[in-house]
Swiss-Prot record:
Recorded name of the encoding gene: uvrC
TM region positions: none
Function: The UvrABC repair system catalyzes the recognition and processing of DNA lesions. UvrC both incises the 5' and 3' sides of the lesion. The N-terminal half is responsible for the 3' incision and the C-terminal half is responsible for the 5' incision.
Keywords in alphabetical order: Cytoplasm, DNA damage, DNA excision, DNA repair, Excision nuclease, SOS response
Annotated organism of origin: Wolbachia pipientis wMel
Residue ranges annotated for the GIY-YIG domain, each copy included: 14-92
Protein name according to UniProt: UvrABC system protein C
Upper taxonomic lineage: Bacteria, Pseudomonadati, Pseudomonadota, Alphaproteobacteria, Rickettsiales
BP GO annotations: nucleotide-excision repair; SOS response
SUPFAM superfamilies: C-terminal UvrC-binding domain of UvrB (SSF46600), GIY-YIG endonuclease (SSF82771), RuvA domain 2-like (SSF47781)
Record-stated family: Belongs to the UvrC family.
Any one GO CC term of the record: excinuclease repair complex
HAMAP family (alphabetical): UvrC
Gene Ontology MF terms: DNA binding; excinuclease ABC activity
Subcellular location: Cytoplasm
């Protein structure tokens, strides 16, 4: 530890504030808060009492920057803001987990049933779940289709089709798209499906049995048989229903951890509606207690885009409860209480969140260990100095040299890091020259906004000719990163891939080896991202240019449409009334636009 760093700590003020540990090239290593800065920073001078991770960090520290705040609340909020913007290497790292799958029933005039993951859109769907198994969701939807003949097609397909699809032919849909069922009867089926998902199976079954017996007594045996089959399929649906309702706006939190990794789940209620349970993962937790992790998480969670409810339930006591409540008051502009469960209902909801956290953490660790095993083997095969934490994969896409695009995907020890993916629209006109395209992509990547983030390994979709291109770019930019080029076999199919590296003979791997399958999955993901990115770019350019061909649509109206909706995709999803809201668009013209845009998208898809 440098002498000047020690002197800086000794001269720090005995006041409340935030401190930054800064390393080489002004890289922020850690951000912390303290009620007494001098006292807190002096703890770091007790080197032998610190954990190995903190000792390693301190050896990299060149200076400490201090921000004095008026009180602990300001320090808490500033710390959260700096951690979010700077992403220091040694702070607790918070990441979104996978959303649990839900079953949704849309609020369309003829509702659709579907599986859904992601953030809730309460104005568009009713949500049922969560389910811990995607297979359970799929099976439940299938049984609900058979029992109630609900549609699963997209709204776009529903509005444009002229004949029933295969789902109608195999008796899994009542074909409301072509009026094979009345709206009232279809909505009655939807209501019964919703009641089933709410755990009211017995009530629905009695309704179906009553209708079946009525049809039978009227000698309408064909219809009676249909209702008999519905009852049979209904009995196959096993939904463990728990009362996931709460009268007040509230969030329920739970934390489960194993060594350096913690999973925090939150179950949210707003306006008496269940907004679902979402897992988040916190890394670098080894030096922190559960209550410290949860305290940090709460401030970060609500200091971003989430508005705190009036009640927040946590399993145990947390650090600085009163200060956190005051900080959240500043965010919400209303009193916020951090509470413990007092009754059975609250305890049941906390237990549910805890069980979700436990399940999510177990799955995360299984995925992590599987990935780590592959990465250890990969580091040996490709002679890497360390097990890679960040792998970047590059691919290009174009059509006959036009609309050229390059992509970068990122994978780490926890899997694909999709928030790190990047697209590069090729600026120069290279007429499909893959080498020049790759040179531009790599140059922009390592001299652009994220140039400070250096990967541990590069995988290039290319052959021996790409090796010198990559080497030249890295040398010019003074970057030392191991890389390999991966070329497909003779028939350009998966299998018999060849690898090319600087200073090594070309080599191949066994087609069934774990590393080979892993590298193929990386290459395929990069290829998928390149193709879909290119398709979106191409489709957008095509359809926007085609808008001008609609009779009555000139540049002024085209600009008005794109300004109002933002994209052609949004136009295709809009209602007739919404399109009419655009200045200069009449009802007749709105009808033409809607038909045209939906037709063009259908052709492209």
């Amino acid at each position: 530890m440098l002498r000047q760093y020690k002197e800086q700590i000794k001269s720090s003020p005995q006041s409340c504030g935030v401190y930054k540990m800064v390393g080489d090239k002004n890289k922020v290593l850690y951000v912390g808060k303290a009620k007494n800065l001098k006292s807190r920073l002096s703890d770091y001078l007790q080197f032998e009492n610190l954990s190995e991770r903190i000792r390693v960090m301190l050896l990299q520290v060149i200076k400490v920057e201090i921000f004095i705040t008026e009180n602990e609340i300001e320090a808490l909020l500033l710390e959260a803001q700096l951690i979010k913007s700077l992403k220091p290497l040694y702070n607790i790292v918070l990441k979104d987990g996978k959303f649990y799958p839900y079953i949704t029933i849309s609020k369309h005039d003829y509702p659709r049933i579907a599986k859904y993951r992601g953030k809730f859109k309460k104005n568009e769907f009713h949500y049922y779940g969560p389910f811990t198994s995607a297979a359970a969701v799929k099976q439940t939807i299938l049984s609900l289709q058979k029992a109630f003949l609900l549609r699963v097609c997209s709204d776009q397909y529903f509005s444009s089709t002229k004949r029933p699809c295969i789902e109608y032919q195999i008796k899994r849909c009542s074909a409301p798209c072509i009026n094979k069922i009345t709206k009232d009867d279809y909505c009655q089926s939807v209501k019964q499906a919703r009641n089933t998902l709410l755990g009211r199976n017995k009530e629905v079954k009695e309704q179906l049995l009553f209708t079946m017996r009525k049809c039978s007594s009227e000698e309408n045996y064909e219809l009676a048989a249909i209702y008999r089959d519905r009852v049979k399929f209904l009995e196959q649906i096993q939904i463990q229903h728990t009362d996931f309702s709460f009268e007040k706006d509230a969030d329920f939190f739970s934390i489960v951890r194993e060594e350096d990794l913690a999973c925090i789940s939150v179950l949210s209620f707003r306006n008496k509606d269940n907004y679902g349970s979402t897992p988040y993962f916190a890394e670098n937790c080894g030096d922190h207690s559960n209550d410290e992790i949860l305290s940090t998480f709460l401030v970060n969670f609500y200091n971003s885009a989430n508005i705190p409810p009036i009640q927040i339930y946590v399993p145990d006591s947390i650090v600085d409860k009163e200060i956190i409540e005051q900080a959240l008051y500043k965010v919400a502009q209303k009193p916020v209480k951090v509470l413990h469960a007092k009754n059975k209902k609250e305890r049941d909801l906390l237990k549910f969140v805890y069980d979700n956290s436990q399940h999510s953490l177990e799955q995360k660790l299984i995925d992590y260990r599987n990935n780590l095993e592959k990465l250890e083997e990969l580091s040996k095969i490709f002679l890497l100095p360390n097990i890679p934490k960040r792998i970047e994969v590059y691919d290009n896409s174009h059509i006959s040299g036009s609309q050229q695009i390059g992509v970068m995907i990122v994978a780490g020890q926890e899997g694909f890091l999709k928030s790190e993916y990047r697209k590069f629209t090729i600026k120069e006109k290279f007429s499909g020259d893959d080498y020049k395209m790759m040179r531009e992509v790599l140059t922009r990547r390592f001299s652009g906004n994220i140039k400070g983030i250096i990967p541990d390994f590069l995988l290039i979709d290319g052959g021996p000719g790409h090796v010198s291109i990559v080497q030249n770019v890295l040398e010019v930019l003074n970057i030392n990163v191991p890389f390999a080029c991966m070329a497909k076999g003779p028939d350009r199919n998966a299998g018999n891939e060849r690898f090319y590296m600087l200073g090594r003979e070309e080599f191949s791997l066994a087609n069934d080896s774990k590393v080979m399958l892993y590298l193929q999955s990386l290459r395929n993901e990069a290829h998928r991202f390149a193709i879909t990115s290119h398709r979106k770019k191409r489709d957008k350019q095509f359809i926007v240019s085609q808008l001008s061909k609609i009779p009555g649509i000139g540049n002024k109206r085209k600009k008005a449409l794109m300004s109002y909706f933002g994209s052609v995709k949004n136009i295709s999803r809009a209602s007739l009334a919404e399109i009419q809201n655009v200045p200069g668009i009449s009802k007749g013209l709105a009808e033409v636009i809607l038909k045209y845009v939906n037709y063009k998208r259908g052709v492209l898809e």
